Amino acid sequence: PVPGTIETLIENSILRKARTEGIVQFHVIDLRDFGKGNYRQIDDKPFGGGDGMILMAEPLSQAIEMAIGKVGGLEGTHIVFPSPSGQIWSQDVATECSQLERVIFICGHYKGIDERIIEKYVTHEYSIGDFVLTSGEVPAMLILDSMVRLIPGVLNSIESALTDSFPHGLLDHPHYTQPRIVDDVAVPDVLLSGHHAKIQKWKKEKREERTQKKRPDLWKKYLSEKNRNG
């Protein structure tokens, strides 16, 4: 419902480069274009009572059908609805979805969307966490950004994306740049040693140390997978 929000995020992120260089295409559809009546109504009160407003099925259906036409049909197309009911979005899922050729995002608003739209069109629901936002543009763009940055050619170095937090199953290690000393705190000597094996060992130790301290849930999962894989 708020195309300007999406365009602003695209134009001020790596997504702009992806679009400019023809790596990806974005088509932003304004749900208001399919609204009913002089006021272009797109929401109404829920049947059965309750607070909040629900995005109506008819405008959504028309907008989705237009999107399906723009991407070339339903075959092989993922239709994603960011929702607290969905699978938790993760780096693993982002990596998998970065291989997709056609994705349609439905951005919810208000209390939610008519359930009949979910039943008819949505192929995947993803959650970015156990909290509620006022608009679906934010989670949709979060999901999109995490996918697109993994497509070859989007980042200057794909290695940068592959060595961020989580591909190791761990948080990322600390990073340092110039100057060597800031407020009497120096860069660890090992990073200046030029000894590749020692540097890699330090990075691995710091990833493990940071994950164990800051994300015990990830640490537990990491140990479980490590033991399972021998």
PLM regions: where:
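Short glycine-enriched loops at secondary-structure junctions
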Residues: 31-34, 109-113
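SAM-dependent methyltransferases
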Residues: 179-230
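Hydrophobic/aromatic beta-strand patches that form the interior of the parallel beta-sheet core
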Residues: 27-29, 80, 103-104, 124-126
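Structured adenosyl-cofactor binding patch, chiefly the S-adenosyl-L-methionine
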Residues: 113, 117-164
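N-terminal nucleotide/polyanion-binding subdomain common to many enzyme families
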Residues: 1-71, 196-218
